[in-house]
Amino acid sequence: MKTFYLTDAGKVRSHNEDSVTILKNDAGEYLLIVADGMGGHRAGEVASSMVVTHLGKRFNDLVTVGTKYDATNWLKDNISEINHHIVEYASNNPESKGMGTTVVVALLTHDFLLYANVGDSSGFAMKNGHLLKVTKDHTLVQLLVQAGDLTEEEAKYHPKKNVLMKALGGEEDVVPDIYEVDMSFDAVLLSSDGLTNMLSNEAIEKVLNDPELSIEDKVVKLIRKCNARGGTDNISVAYLVKESGE
């Protein structure tokens, strides 16, 4: 596997409230995390960092994530646990009231690939040159799409497309959605909405399919393209690619 991750404040925000990492354990399992924080007085920065630190530590404490059943429970339990920590932190630090964060995670073992998400950070898989969105956003417009009141195209330009229905820190009990992707995937991409609000899936796919670019150059180019279009938000990308024979 080849991996690379990068985060950028963008062109408008004075500081970066995203956090991102990719970890590999001794069993050859990978954990990719992107978290997009929110809240004043740098509270969002704290929230997203808490998520990445907590999940990273829990992952590093494991010898292996075990079976698919074990891994699913591990994702649910640890995302629920860090949600409680964020809620508690906000209650003990009044200046951080309203703090929260999205999270999207990919957990890859030799036998399965799982995604978990809360909020509107996105998890994608690449298969045969096609970029497929795996996760569903916890937003008002996504609910309207699922109800048949909006088309996917209308949702892209809806004035309330960034209104979250669920995030870590928002309420006492939060359970992530879990998705599985079969092992025929070619690559995994996670991103904050700073990428997906600026670039269409087709534009992202085009960059990822460029044979002239290294994995690092692809991630850098995605972020540069977002900034060239205004860079209105922090932008974070975590990218994992299968090498030939894997």
Q: Which residues does each predicted region cover?
A:
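PP2C/PPM-type serine/threonine phosphatase catalytic domain
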Residues: M1-E246
